[in-house]
């Protein structure tokens, strides 16, 4: 992260750090906010976060930005207020404060549950791979955060959209082919 911060600083690129999944680390792993890496990262970043993913309250439309740099903070403040997206309702504010301040036991249970889901997925992939020819094996990309899984299916097909449709139709499993993140989806 420090190297990314240095490169962005040197090339006058502001880092917008989407840390919406920050609370969803696997048990035993910690989250490192980008702005906490060093002063350079803090002064050249906008950290976006919300309780919406972790606490399943997206309908409340609540989020926050943390911007240590006062000049950058003012620019973002102007943009948010010009577009009138900076006025949360009272219920959203109360729910957000409760989520962040009063939910640690529940959050620890959630993190353990999600880690169990990942272990189950890993076991299923290992079982599949044990029976599959080497050229047909898939790989679970190791991750220690979020409830999302990245599965490399490039040995199965180059038509990831077709694979996703097959999995949805025949196995009731929803996949995103990943093309929206750039590249060819595998």
Model-based region annotation:
Residues 8, 38, 125, 129, ...:
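A generic structural signal for well-ordered alpha-helical segments
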Residues 136-139, 148-186:
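Conserved C-terminal alpha-helix-loop-beta "cap" of PLP-dependent enzymes
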Residues 39-115, 165:
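Conserved core segment of the aminotransferase class I/II
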Residues 18:
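Glycine-centered flexible beta-alpha turn that most often forms the glycine-rich phosphate-binding loop
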